[in-house]
Amino acid sequence: MIYSLLIIFFMFFSFHRMDLAVSNTYRFSFETNSIPLWIPKKVSMLWIFSIGNVLAFAPFGVLLPEAFTRLSRSYWRPAAAFFAAVIFLELMQMVTFLGSFDVEDILVNFMGFTIGFAAWRQGRKVDSVFKGILIFMAYIFLLTVVLLICAEFINRFLL
């Protein structure tokens, strides 16, 4: 619950979002020309923000199935619940003028959830809590690297 509130705070009130509310202009983007992730040649604030947008939502891949045990039987139930919640939050950002409805954000947030869920599933397979946490962290790292490589390939050769 606390983590969810923290994410909502960042989505609505950080990064000078209150300055955006003054304009009373709906901001939205329903299209994407690329996956907003890449392998950096040089680390920049934009890249950190983009990768942070993935990793910030990875914990929901653990929190949703753990909080609602009925959701943990498959990937699709918690994924659908997360997807609906992210769409709702993106819409709220737009209608409150504290952000924008951005399809790329939904895509990247959902990738983060999926990474978290896959890592959680792998970490649960061991009996030791310590080993489970290590496996979880290793999978988060590994899957994030794989995601960056895939996004770079798709952006460069397929889009």
Task: Show where each model-derived region lies.
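Bulky hydrophobic segments
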Residues: M1-F97, V103, F117-L159
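Alpha-helical transmembrane segments and their membrane-interface exit regions
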Residues: V108-F117
